[in-house]
C-alpha cells in the first residue's frame, strides 16, 4: 500500500510482514500496521464529504501494474454480470419489491463503464472507516482492492448515508448517472445476498435498511 498511501490524505495500513500459503491457510497473508481511530457508527454530511474526497484521491492514484478485479478480489469492481444469476435468484428468494429490484438491476447491467479502470478499495463497510473527532482519518482492510470500476466504492451511499448525506456524497464524488446506476446495482446485490442467506443479525438489519434506501431512492425517475 505505500504506493497508494502517498496519494491519500487519510491514513491506510502499511504491511509489516507477508506470509506465504501453508497447509492450514492456502493463501498469501499479511500483518498490517495498526491505526488509531473509532469505527464509523454514525454518518454525517461532513463524513460524506470526507469519504468523497478520499475516493477522488484514490481514483486519481496511478494504477501502475496492479491487477484488475477478478476471483482474487471476489470481482469487486468487475463486471456486475458475474453476479447476474445470483442476484436474480436472490430477488425471487427475498420477494417484496421484485419489479423495482429487477428494474434497478437491469439498469445497472445496462450502464456500462465509460472510463478507464481506477484504484478501488472494494469493501467500504462502516467498520473499515475510522474516525478521529468525527472526521474520516483512516481507511483499513484493503484485501479486496484492485484496479477496476469505481462503482463498487459508492455502495456506502445506501449502506451508510441517509438521503441528505447521500446527495452530498454523490456531489462530492461527482458521479455521473451511469456510474451511480452501477453503484446501485452493487448495493442491491450485496443486500439481497445477505437477506437471501441469513435470517437474523446485524447484517440482516443493515441489508434491510440498504434495500429500503434503494427502493426509496429516486435515481430511476
Predicted segments, located by residue:
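Helix-rich C-terminal or lid/interface subdomains of diverse kinases
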Residues: 144-147, 152-221
Amino acid at each position: 500500500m505505500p504506493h497508494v498511501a502517498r496519494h491519500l490524505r487519510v491514513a491506510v495500513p502499511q504491511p509489516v510482514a507477508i506470509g506465504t500459503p501453508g497447509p492450514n491457510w492456502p493463501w498469501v497473508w499479511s500483518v498490517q500496521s495498526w491505526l488509531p481511530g473509532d469505527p464509523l457508527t454514525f454518518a454525517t454530511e461532513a463524513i460524506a464529504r470526507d469519504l468523497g474526497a478520499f475516493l477522488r484521491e484514490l481514483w486519481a492514484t496511478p494504477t501502475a501494474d496492479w491487477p484488475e478485479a477478478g476471483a482474487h478480489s471476489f470481482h469487486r469492481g468487475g463486471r456486475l454480470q458475474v453476479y447476474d444469476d445470483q442476484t436474480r435468484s436472490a430477488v425471487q428468494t427475498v420477494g417484496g419489491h421484485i419489479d423495482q429490484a429487477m428494474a434497478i438491476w437491469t439498469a445497472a447491467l445496462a450502464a456500462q463503464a465509460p472510463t478507464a479502470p481506477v484504484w478501488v478499495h472494494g469493501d467500504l463497510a462502516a467498520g473499515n472507516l475510522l474516525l478521529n473527532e468525527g472526521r474520516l482519518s483512516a481507511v483499513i482492510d484493503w484485501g479486496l482492492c484492485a484496479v477496476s470500476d469505481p462503482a463498487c466504492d459508492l455502495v456506502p451511499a445506501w449502506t451508510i448515508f441517509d438521503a441528505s448525506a447521500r446527495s452530498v456524497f454523490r456531489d462530492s464524488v461527482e458521479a455521473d448517472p451511469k456510474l451511480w446506476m452501477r453503484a446501485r446495482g452493487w448495493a442491491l446485490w450485496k443486500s439481497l445476498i445477505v437477506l437471501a442467506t441469513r435470517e437474523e443479525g446485524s447484517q440482516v438489519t443493515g441489508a434491510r435498511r440498504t434495500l429500503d434506501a434503494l427502493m426509496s431512492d429516486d435515481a430511476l425517475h
